[in-house]
Amino acid sequence: MGFNPQGQGNGPNYDAPREMQDLPAGQAYHFRESDETAAARVSPVSNPYEPDYDQLSPPPPLGAQRPVPEQNESSRDLLHSSYQGSVGHNSFDGHSFGHNSYGPGAFGHYPADQHGRMPGSPGYEYPEPEYDVEASRLAESRLSVMHRAPTMQDWGQNGEALSVPDFAHGRPDSTYQEFDVDESWMMRQQQNQLAGGLGRSKTRKVKLVQGSVLSIDYPVPSAIKNAVEPRYRSGPGSMEEEFTKMRYTAATCDPNDFTLRNGFNLRPKMYNRHTELLIAITYYNEDKVLLARTLHGTMQNIRDIVNLKRSKFWNKGGPAWQKIVVCLVFDGIDKVDKNVFDVLATVGIYQDGVLKKDVNGKETVAHIFEYTSQVSVTPDQQLVRPDPDKPHRNLPPVQFIFCLKQKNSKKINSHRWLFNAFGRILNPEVAILIDAGTKPGPRALLSLWEGFYNDRDLGGACGEIHVMLGKGGKMLLNPLVAVQNFEYKISNVLDKPLESAFGYVSVLPGAFSAYRFRAIMGRPLEQYFHGDHTLSKSLGKKGIDGMNIFKKNMFLAEDRILCFELVAKASQKWHLSYIKASKGETDVPEGAAEFIGQRRRWLNGSFAMSLYSLMHFGRMYGSGHNLIRLFFLHIQFVYNLVNVLFSWFSLAAFYLTTTIIMKLVGTPQVLSEYHGWPFGDTATPIVNVLIKYIYIAFLVLQFVLALGNRPKGAQYTYVLSFMVFGLIQLYLLVLTGYLVYRAFTGTPIEEQISFESGKAFFDSFFGGDTGVAGLIIIALFTIYGLNYIASFLYLDPWHMFHSFPQYLVLMSTYINILMVYAFNNWHDVSWGTKGSDTAEALPSAMIVKDEKGKEAVVEEIEQEQEDIDSKFEKVVWRALAPMSEMAEEKPEKKDVEDSYKSFRTGLVILWLLCNIVLIVVVTTDDFITLGVSKAADVRTPTYFRVLLYSTAVLSIVRFFGFLWFIGRTGIMCCIARR
C-alpha cells in the first residue's frame, strides 16, 4: 500500500497521507494482475503464514449473498471512487492494481502541478486539501461477495452503483479456506514475531512503567487516523497521539490492583479529562453483527449528546466527546467470535500481533487497548466515516477502552474490571451498562443521563427494552417471539412504572441500565463482587466457593443483588427509577431450547433473590430513606410477598383452573338445564377426561425431561410440549368465553347486579350470593381491561393486538415447562473458569536491560506504516464480508456436586407437595371426615373468588402505580434541566 512519500515511517515527523482511502477496496487496495506477478512481489524473507494470505481466495459465505445497497447523495459505496490518472506508486491499467495502490491522489482527482507533473509521478506536489478526507460521504458501505477483478467500467464515478456481481478473484486473499477463523486469528498473532512484518521492520526498546507495566503505543493505519476531522484533531483539549497511536497495556494483575500507584493509567486520566459518562459494553461470544449493532448505536447516541445546542452542562468545560468514554469488556479470548476482532480493528481499537500472553513469565490477565476513533461499522457490514459537507451528521470522536480478558471468568468479573479498575481511575459520574447485541435507540443514553442529572438521589435507572421484531414485524410469526414481546412490553407498561413509583426497581436489566458511580461504591459493589469466582480464595466463606446453593442461585440474577444493596445502603437514600424515554432493542431466543435455557437462569435467580430481599427487608430501616419512602417500600414488600406466594402455588393454580372450568362447562346440569358443551352431553365429559389425562401426562413428562435431558437434546419433545399445552389453553379460553356468555344469559343481569343502594351494588360484586356476573366483570376488567387502558395511555398499544393472543395461549407453559425445568435444575450452577488454549499461542514479552544495564525494557518489533496499511487492507475485507453461519457451540461438561442435587430434590419435593395439597384441599370431599364441614363444591368457588379478587387487587395496584409514573414523567419533562 502506498504512503506519503514526503513522510515515510512512523517517527515524530511522520506526515500521514492527506486523503483517506475509500474502504474497503477501490484504489485503497492492491489487486494482483496475475498469479505470476503476485508471486514476483513476495518478500524474500520467508514467512510460513504470509503466503497463505496472498495466495488463497476466501470462501464464499454460507447463506444468501447480500446485495450491494442502493446509493444516494448521502450514502456512497466505499468500493467506488473517481479513478482518473494514476492512483499510487504503481499505475492502474484498467484491469488491476499494483501492490502499492493508494497515495495522496488515490481518493479524488488532482490536476497537474505547477511543473506539469501528473498525480502519482515522481516529484508531484499534491495541493493541500480543505479536509483530510476529501469528498468523503457519510458512507455506510457494505462489502458484497465478488469473484473477479474489477475493470474500469465496473467502478463508475463517485456515488454510482457498483455493477460488478463478483469481485474476489484478484484481491488479496486470506487463509480462510485452509484454516478456520480461530486458527487464522492465532496465526496472525505470530506474524510479527516470525517474519518481522514484510521484512523491513526494525526493533525498538520499550521502557516498562515502574519496571513491570508493559504499555506500548502502536501507529494506527493511515485510513483510520486520516478519518478524523481537522476540527477535532486540532480542537481544544485534543491530543495528537490519541488519533495517531493505539495504546496497548498488558495488565498482569487483578482488577483491584489496576491502580495509578502500581503504574497503570488510562488516556482520559493522562489527558486530565473529566469523565461524566462511562459506557460499558460487556461481551461474551456474540457475532460481529450483534457487536456492531451495539457499538454503532452507542456512537450514534454520543453524536446526539455532542450535537446538543442548548445544554447547560455538555457545552461547558471542554468538548462533550471528551467527557464520554466507551469501554468494551470481552470475557475471555477462547469464547470470542474471532470475526469480531476485524470489526474492532477496522474501527481502530485493536490490532493483530500486539497481544502478549505474559510479561517476563507473569501471565497477562487482561489486554487493554485505547484509541479515539471517528470510524464505525454498522450491523449491515457498512463502513461509516466523516462527511465534510455534513458535519452535523458525522460521528464524533469516541474515546475507546477495549479490555480483552485472557480467560473466561464470567460477567461479574468483567464488571469488576469496569468498576474497580477503570472506574476508580476515571471516576465517572454515571456508568451505563449495555450487553453486546442490545442496540440503544435514538437519544437513549442521553435520556438515561438526564435522569441522574435532574435527580441527585437517583442511584440507578433503566430504560425500556423492547424485542427486535424484524422488518415489518415478521418475527411475530414465531409465537415464542410474540410471547416474549408481550412480556417485555407489559413489564415496561405496568411492572417497571409501579416499582419506579415505590423507589425500588427489583431488577435493572444488565443489558441496558445505568448507575451513579459513587452510589454503588462501597457495600453494593462489595456484596455484588462476592459472586466473582476469581475472589473465592481470598474471600473464603464469603466467596462463591463458601456459599450454599441458594446464594449461588442468587448470583444467577446478579443485577438484582446490586439493586437491593443500592436501595438498602446504610445511611443513604438512593432510589431506583425507570426512564420511559430511553429505549433499547434486543434480540430474544427464537427456539424452544434456547428459551428454556435462558429462563432457567432468570427464574431461579429471581426467585432466590426475591426471597433474599424479603428476608432482609429490615435493612431498609438502617438506610436514610424518609418516612414516606419507607411507607411505600412496605407496600411494595407486601406486594412482592403475595407475588412470591402466587408463583409458588402457580402449578396447582393452572391445573385447578383447567380441570374445574372443563367440569363446569362440560358436565350436564339437569336442574339448570345446562348441557355439556361443546360436544354434547355424552362426548364432552369424555373429551374433557382425555384432555385432563393428557395434561397430567405432559406435566409428568416435563419433570422427566428436566431431570435427565438438556433442552437442546430434547428440543423436539419440548416443541411438542409447547404445542400441547398451547392447544389445551386455547380450548380452555374457548370454554371460558362460553362460561362468561352463560353467566350473563342464564340469569337476567338486573338480578345479578342491583342498583337499589350502594350496599346492594357492592354486594353484587363482592357479596357472593347474587350471581357471578359481578365477579366476572371484575376479573375481565382487571385482567384484560386495565392492560388495554394502560397500553393506550402509554401510547404503545400494538402489542395488545399482535402479541397478547399468543401470550394467552402459551401462558401456561411459563409454569408447566419453564418453571418445572428451572426448579428441577436448581443445582445447575457452574462458576469454574476454563484455561485459554488460544492464549497459549500468543507471543510473550521478555524483559531485558537497556544498553546501560539499568532500566527494564521490552524489545518490540516496529512496523513500517506501509506494512500496517497493507495488513489493514485485509482486516477491512474480513470485517465487511457477509457473515457466515456459525457452528453450534459445543456444550460444556459440568461436574455437579451431590449436595446441590440433594438440595434440588428437596426443593422440588416441597414445591410439588404444597401444590398437591392445594389441589386436594380444593377438589376432594375426603376432608369432611376430618371435621371440615364444607364440601368440595363449596370450597372450589371460594378458592376461585379468592384467586380472582387477589389478582384484581394486584392489577389495580399496578395500574395506580402506572398512573403515578405517567403523571410524574409528564411533569418532569416540563421542568427537567438539560
Curated annotation (Swiss-Prot):
GO terms for biological process: cell wall organization; chitin biosynthetic process. It catalyses: [(1->4)-N-acetyl-beta-D-glucosaminyl](n) + UDP-N-acetyl-alpha-D-glucosamine = [(1->4)-N-acetyl-beta-D-glucosaminyl](n+1) + UDP + H(+). The keyword DNA damage does not apply. It is an enzyme of class 2 (transferase). Coiled coil: none annotated. Its main location: membrane. It is a multi-pass membrane protein. It is found in: Cell membrane. Its EC number is 2.4.1.16. Keywords: Cell membrane, Cell wall biogenesis/degradation, Glycoprotein, Glycosyltransferase, Membrane, Transferase, Transmembrane, Transmembrane helix. One of its GO terms (molecular function) is chitin synthase activity. Residues 1-95, 108-127 are annotated as: Disordered. Disruption phenotype: Leads to lethality. Glycans are attached at N72, N604. One of its GO terms (cellular component) is cell septum. The chain crosses the membrane at residues 641-661, 686-706, 719-739, 775-795, 803-823, 908-928, 946-966. Residues 1-13 have a biased composition (Low complexity). PANTHER family: CHITIN SYNTHASE, CHITIN SYNTHASE B. Polymerizes chitin, a structural polymer of the cell wall and septum, by transferring the sugar moiety of UDP-GlcNAc to the non-reducing end of the growing chitin polymer. Is essential for viability. Belongs to the chitin synthase family. Class III subfamily. This is Chitin synthase 3. It comes from Fusarium oxysporum f. sp. lycopersici (strain 4287 / CBS 123668 / FGSC 9935 / NRRL 34936) (Fusarium vascular wilt of tomato). The gene is chs3.
